[in-house]
Structure formats: structure tokens, C-alpha cells
Amino acid sequence: LRAFAQRRDKKLAAHAVRFDKRWSPTITVRPMHPNPAFRQTSRDRNLAFSRARGFGILSVNGPDGPLAAHVPFLLSEDASFADLHLARSNPLARADLPGPALLAVSGPDTYISPDWYGPHAQVPDQVPTWNYVAVHLRGVLEPLPPQALGTHVDELSAEHEQRIIGKTPWTSAKMTEGAKDRMLRMILPFRLRIVAVDGTWKLNQNKPPEVRARAAEALAKGDAAAQAIAALMREKPET
């Protein structure tokens, strides 16, 4: 197992050097949703949402088809990259990297019934739909040197610990000697260098204001996700 880890670490270092030499794939960026009404949110808000969420689905093209992993991540201060880690045994960690990747960050979502738009005589021929918030971070996924892992996991846990009210933040200093190193050997660090940010905030913007307001009123009586969407639907449009 140790020999495998050493071989893998050498490969990671070689990949990092290859990226430093300005290796760059061709990345074609297409809108997540074809309707421009749902793509009016600013880059800053899309990034703020992604930073606050801190969790997404990472996907790359594998030799036998798409590979995906659900990962926590830490967005850099200037939003030029997102750092994350994967289990050594994860097929995505063994993909041919650096390479194009997509990190999909999802927010609240909920079903929309046509009945909520109003009487059929006033709003005829409506169909069910789904409202949601999602941001796609596209870029180049590269392995990081193994020595970057300790700092990454400490910064990641610190970010989320400081959000918890009412307790002293947990740190890896609480772990027994050697335990952290044993666990770190089971994961690998990666960095997504962000090339494009694409957000979809599908909130019935293609409906008249009064119709949208009725749907929001109905959603406000639903579960937490429905209420979150209702609150977003009631916000004033960005200018």
C-alpha cells in the first residue's frame, strides 16, 4: 500500500509540473439553461452562492464514460479556483488529469403546480415545472502536491466550523498523534482552476408578476425548500 501511495504521489507531482508549464485543454462553455430569463444573476452572486454552499457534484470524462463525485470544496478569495479532495479509491481520483471538469453546485428546488398560477380562465394551458437554483463552475481539474493536503483539510474544516454557533471550533489538533497522518493517506488533494461561472436561477421569471406572486404565495405554505424558493421569487430583480 505504501509503495502504491509513493507511485501515486510521484504521478501527482508530475501532473502539477505539467500544469505549471501552461498545459491547457480546450473548454467549450455553453449556457446551462437556454432561456436567458433564468440567467440574469450576476457573477458575484453566483460565486457568493457557491461559496456559501460549499458542496457540489464534480464531474469529468473518464475512459469508460462520465465520472462524478460529491465533494465539499473551498473557493479561493478571488474565486479563481476551488480546492477539494477525493478518496484515493475514488475512480475520479485516478482519471487522466489535468483535464476539463465541471463542479455543479445546487441550491433549493421545488415542484410548481400549474394550479398555483391562477384560475384556468385567466391563465390557460399551463404545465407543471420545477424551480431551482444551480451554479456550474467550469475549469481545469489538476492534482495538487501531497504536501498541500494537510493545509487544505484544516482550512476546509475551519471554514465550516466557524459557521456553527455556540461551540468552540473543532481543529485537527484534537486528534491523537499519528491519527491525522493515517487519515490523510486515504485522500488526495485537487484544485479546480475556474474558467467560467454559469448560474441558473429558475424562478418563474418568464411569467407575469401577478402570476409569479400567486405561485410564490402557494410555495410559502410548503416545506423548507419550497419556502426558500418562494423567498427568492419575491426578491426584486437584479439591476
Predicted regions and their residues:
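N-terminal polybasic/positive-inside topogenic patches
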Residues: 1-22
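A generic local secondary-structure boundary/capping motif
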Residues: 47, 126, 179-182
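Short, structured beta-strand-loop surface elements
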Residues: 88-152
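Short beta-strand segments
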Residues: 52-88, 103
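A short, structural micro-pattern
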Residues: 52, 67, 78, 97-98, ...
